[in-house]
A protein has these predicted regions:
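An amphipathic, aromatic/His-enriched active-site/gating alpha helix that lines ligand/cofactor pockets
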Residues: 68-97
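Conserved aromatic-histidine-acidic binding/catalytic patches
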Residues: 19, 62, 71-75
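Short S/T/G/P-rich N-terminal loop/turn motif that feeds into the first structured element of a domain
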Residues: 1-57, 70, 97-149
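Extended cationic-aromatic binding surfaces that line active-site or macromolecule-binding grooves
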Residues: 41, 64-65
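Short hydrophobic/aromatic beta-strand micro-patches
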Residues: 11, 62-64
Length: 149
């Protein structure tokens, strides 16, 4: 069995304790609680309970889902979509994908290095069954047949 890993990467405009980030930080727990109660949500496998891996001005938010469709509903409908509309208040553009989707064996918790490999692959190769996006998605079957370039 396979599950969908979603890694969201963001470059913050300021440190998490800066007043500019206050609304974002204040809403993290609510958004995470909504994710946990959403159909298809499996887990948020990170070292910190709030689901964020923080490295300087970069944030990595991981979540595991049963399907692309379940994640897509959570992401683009409801309260989370309102936060997405405000993302430019808190996050800067940067070169590279701001998220990646990929299929992983159920129960496997990806490391930061594994996620980085998928992000780099998406940036260099475009969407493939190894690393893809909502707009260019692939099935587990396609992933199993895919050979890395």
């Amino acid at each position: 069995m396979y599950h969908l890993t979603h890694a969201n990467i963001a470059k913050m405009r300021a440190q998490l304790d800066d007043p500019l980030m206050a609304d974002f930080v204040m809403n993290v727990d609510e958004i995470d609680a909504l994710a946990r109660s959403s159909p298809g949500f499996i887990t948020q496998p990170t070292p910190r309970d709030e689901g964020l891996i923080y490295n300087g001005k970069m944030l990595l938010n991981l979540s595991i889902w049963e399907s692309v469709e379940d994640l897509e509903i959570f992401t683009y409908q409801g309260v989370h979509s309102l936060m997405l509309e405000r993302r430019r208040e808190w996050f800067e553009s940067y070169d590279g994908p701001n998220y990646v989707l990929y299929w992983e064996i159920a129960g496997h918790i990806p490391s930061e290095a594994e996620v980085q490999q998928r992000v780099e692959y998406l940036a260099n190769q475009g969407p493939t069954p190894f690393a893809f996006t909502f707009d260019n998605r692939f099935t587990v079957g396609e992933m199993l047949e895919y050979r890395l370039e």
